[in-house]
Every structure is written in structure tokens, then in C-alpha cells.
Amino acid sequence: MAVAAGALPAADLFAQGTTSDVRGAKSLRAHAQLRGLLVGCAVVPGKLHGERDYADLVGAQANILVAENAMKWKALRPAPDKFDFRGADAILAFASRHGQKVRGHNLCWHEALPDWFAGTVTKDNARQIFTEHIRTVAGRYARKLHSWDVVNEAIDTKSGRPDGLRKSPWLELIGPEYIDVAFRTARAADPKALLTYNDYGIEEDSAEQTAKREGVLQLVQGMKKRGVPIDAVGVQSHLSASDPLPGAGLREFVRELGRMKLQVFVTELDINERKVEGSVAERDAAVARVYKDYVTMMVAEPNVSAVLTWGITDRYTWLDAPKYARPDGQPQGCLPFDANYEPAPAFFALRDALDSRRSNEQ
């Protein structure tokens, strides 16, 4: 394909930097801070304290962190009468040393429940166990966290329920009011953290995702009408480089949340390139384009205040698990840094997108 004079081929559009271009004032966190934004990633405590390159990268690039797994029930509750906060505490300690905020993830989800759950929790004791967990965990970190994902992934439009709620252990054991209970209990335990509902598959304008997005909106509207304390909605943003880019539907959703005085966080951003063909450079360019266009669209909305990726380096990504891996077996390039901790084209695309937000100094 012919390229205009002075233009770069598609594969080179975002391949314009080296490691020296990404630290200090050139880091993601520095660019975000100038624009009143938070930028960060999901982290693993063992790697923060056991892998120097990983820790250095996270410390340099992020001004907000979220635990990938360390704050989920399965990690925190080794036994019905025992809590284990070591991993979560380690993340907060790292963040404190590096001037970073922390998001809590999550207080209620239908997955990542401990092995003892099914044989212990019944309709008679579920509400007590549920509220005790939220009070204990949110209370331990009260006034220390930026926000909590209080309820995660509660909507499933294929459930057959008129309210669109996912069929989950919490719905079965407590009933649909479990969501209100979770948010009210979290607010009582921590009056300062921004209480968030978080979900996936609500970004695109397909019929399925449009319906789910409407389900989330109806859930949040109902909560507001009932006086349930909610401050934000998390849009997970597990996107695909081979799918149509999110557009008008998501933009209007974000704006409607803004009219409800709710913030929006991009909470788990990564770009799956398993179906993208071509060279590594071409695949990297396709991923970078999605980062640039998607984040630019999102941060153009004033109530979008944080962008977090689900990991920071391709060395550690869930998208290389067999269920999501490329058919050709090649590793995915889905995050801002490659497997060798070098900045990928996605890094520069993300940084450019953050720069598109009106600066605090303008």
C-alpha cells in the first residue's frame, strides 16, 4: 500500500519511543495528573514485592492501583472464621510508598468464592455472613481507599429475569435486595470511598451489549431512586481489536450517568488481539489504535476520571490462558508494556489519549 510523503505506515504509527521516553515527566501518571486523571493497573502483591522490574514499572507509571485478586473473597477468607489481609495490606503499603491511590476490588461477586462457601452459607446465615464480610473488609481499609467495586457483574440479560439480574449465589441466598444491602453496608463501614458498580460487556453497540448496558442503567437508576449510596460505575473495557469500536451508545450511557451525578471509571482495560492477523508490528498497531480511539472517547467526558488497565505488562496477562489465547499460539500484545517491560505501541497510544483530555492548566 502506498504511503503519503511524511506519513508512517500503519504498523509504525505508535512505534515512536523507547524506555527513556516513559519515565518521570513522560510517564503515564505524569501525563494523567496534568489532566486531572487517574491512570493505573491491576497488580499482584507477590510480584510487587518479589520482582524488581515489575515493581519499578508499576511505581513509575501508575497513580492508582487495584488488586487483581488479593481483595476477592477467595483470597481474603481461607476459612469461615478467618480473614487473611496480607496480600491486600502489601498492596496498600506499596501504594503508600509510591504516592498512589488504591481501588478495592471487590466486595461482592458471583465468582472467586472460597471453597468452604457452598457447604457453609445457607439462606438462614447468608445475610449475616455477607454483611459481616463487607463491614470487616471495608472497615479495615476505611478512609484509605479511593473507591470500592462493591458489586461486580450483577447483570445478565440472558437470565430470563425481568430485572435482568444474574443468577448468582447471592441472589439465590439473599434475594435481589443483596445489591442494596451491599452498598448500604459498605457506606456505613467506609463513608469516604467512592462506591462503584462494575460490569463488562457494556461497551459496544451490538444488540447484546446494548441490552446489557440498558440493564446496568436501569439497575443504577433504581438504586438512586431508593436512596442507595452509589458514586460511580465501572466500565471494565475488555475490548477486542477485531471488533467494532465502542461509540455512540457508550458515550450516551456515560453522559446519562453524568446527569445522575455519577463518576465513570475505566476499570479493567485490555485489548484482545487473538483474531488479528499479520505481523507482530501490525497486530501491535491494531491494539494501539483501539487504546488511542477508545480512551480518547472516554476521557472526553468530564465524569470519566480514571483509566486502569488489567495488568501492565504482557508478561502477565489472563488473555494468554488457553480459553483466550491466539490460535497460532503466539503471545498476545494487549497491555501498555511488552513481556520484556519495554513500552509497546499501546503505551504511546494510551499516553496520547490521556493528553487529549483538557489540561488542568488550560
Residue ranges of each PLM-predicted region?
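Substrate-binding cleft and catalytic face of glycoside hydrolase catalytic domains
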Residues: V22-G24, L28-R29, I64-P78, G87-E203, ...
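Aromatic- and carboxylate-lined catalytic core of secreted/periplasmic carbohydrate-active enzymes
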Residues: A286-W310, D314-W318, G333, F337-Q362
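Short, acidic/polar
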Residues: G46-A60, Q128-V137, T210-M223, V290-M297
